[in-house]
């Protein structure tokens, strides 16, 4: 049995962490992004399928490429963020399964059912996006996840050559605490959970 993480770690990951809308002018290095990936990749996925693919958009050119895909409410904060991660999924994730899941012929589960492959890729890349958020927080970075963008435009701009499909965007950097909104309420256990 694992030991519980301490209260401070729980605060860092959950109770004191916030979704940021404004960013300090402080860069995020390639080494930091690799450290985030090396942490998030350890989170579980179905049959270790690991379908998430990430483009870390950080250059001025990359941000301008992203600009026309953004909803108006997400434009300013995304252009200001040091990094915007496009979390996508690879529909052909199963080609990596002989390496990632060598216990059996898991690849055939998905090549024989395109619908299962698509559902698995979307579900598990969403799960990995959550791991990305918590890995950023664990590494001292703030995040601002968003779904307000035009997926077709993002896919055309960034994934025309590889067929990946965008799932969500996550701004990454050092959040400006002066631009935080008040914390919104959450549902109680009794409002959201059942015991069966």
Curated annotation (Swiss-Prot):
Per the UniProt entry, the Enzyme Commission number(s) are 1.1.1.298
Q: Which residues form a coiled coil?
A: none
Q: Which GO terms describe its molecular function?
A: 3-hydroxypropionate dehydrogenase (NADP+) activity
What are the required cofactors?
FMN
- Enumerate the UniProt keywords alphabetically: Flavoprotein, FMN, NAD, NADP, Oxidoreductase
- Write down the InterPro entries for this protein, in alphabetical order: Nitroreductase (IPR029479), Nitroreductase-like (IPR000415), Nitroreductase_HadB/RutE (IPR050461), RutE-like (IPR023936)
Membrane-spanning residues where? none
Reactions this protein catalyses: 3-hydroxypropanoate + NADP(+) = 3-oxopropanoate + NADPH + H(+)
Enzyme type, top EC level: oxidoreductase
Superkingdom of the source?
Bacteria
The protein's matches in Pfam families, at most eight in alphabetical order, are given as: Nitroreductase
* Record-level GO BP terms: nitrogen utilization; uracil catabolic process
| SUPFAM superfamilies, A to Z | FMN-dependent nitroreductase-like
Q: Which family does it belong to?
A: Belongs to the nitroreductase family. HadB/RutE subfamily.
Described function:
May reduce toxic product malonic semialdehyde to 3-hydroxypropionic acid, which is excreted.
**What name appears for this protein in its UniProt entry?**
Probable malonic semialdehyde reductase RutE
């Amino acid at each position: 049995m694992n030991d519980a993480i301490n209260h401070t770690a729980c605060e860092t990951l959950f109770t004191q962490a916030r979704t940021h809308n404004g960013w300090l002018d402080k860069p995020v290095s390639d080494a930091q992004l690799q450290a985030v990936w090396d942490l998030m990749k350890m989170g579980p996925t179905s049959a270790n399928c690991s379908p998430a693919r990430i483009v870390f958009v950080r250059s001025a050119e990359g941000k301008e490429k992203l600009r026309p895909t953004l909803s108006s409410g997400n434009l300013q904060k995304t252009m200001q963020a040091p990094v915007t991660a496009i979390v996508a999924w690879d529909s052909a994730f199963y080609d990596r399964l002989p390496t990632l899941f060598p216990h059996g012929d898991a690849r055939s589960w998905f090549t024989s059912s395109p619908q299962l492959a698509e559902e698995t890729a979307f579900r598990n890349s969403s799960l990995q996006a959550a791991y990305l958020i918590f890995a950023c927080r664990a590494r001292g970075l703030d995040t601002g996840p968003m779904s307000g963008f035009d997926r077709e435009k993002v896919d055309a701009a960034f994934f025309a050559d590889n067929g990946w499909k965008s799932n969500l965007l996550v701004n990454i950097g050092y959040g400006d605490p002066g631009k935080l909104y008040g914390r919104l309420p959450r549902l109680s256990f009794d409002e959201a959970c059942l015991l069966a």
